[in-house]
Amino acid sequence: EQSVIWNSWLRLEPNYNQEIVISDSNQRHKDIEAFENDINTAFSEIRRILKDNKHFSLTFHSLSGLEWKAVSNACVFNNFNVVDYEWLEQKTYPPRQLNRVKSIKGDVLVTFRKNPEPVRLRVCDDEQFTTIVSDFITETIENGITDTNGIMMAIMEWIFRNMIIVGNVDVFMILNKQFQLSEDGHWNIK
């Protein structure tokens, strides 16, 4: 992991309890719920120290819709508005990303602005959210964006920009269950 390199270079002792990660280790107790709580705590602290209308940027990569949910909800709850949303493509991909057509390749770079106004949330129940995401994916495919990267980046940008709170729904699962992936790596409407 990069944190090992940075800690070594900076001659720091890592404090694994303070890391915002998901770990399979039984000793670390870093599951998706802890990740969501830690991310929200971090974003609350960013909101506390950041001046009104000032910016911060976040890079993120995950294959888990629940991790994306944790990040997007923390941004929305803390009233950060998207200023810029970019896809950072890598020049070369690790084998894990190359060999999976359902994989997201690269990172997203999102720049947010601290909105000093009261937050205006768009809250849907899980069934409503699943329906509007399914409709959004259908529209995205009909507009010619059919690869996993394009679809997932469009969904996440839409969630961020519309300040939608995501419930217990994994957007990757909506894509996988309600749409069909062709052999050449393009999603189709079932």
Whereabouts are the PLM-identified features?
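S-adenosyl-L-methionine-dependent nucleic acid methyltransferase catalytic domains
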Residues: E1-K190
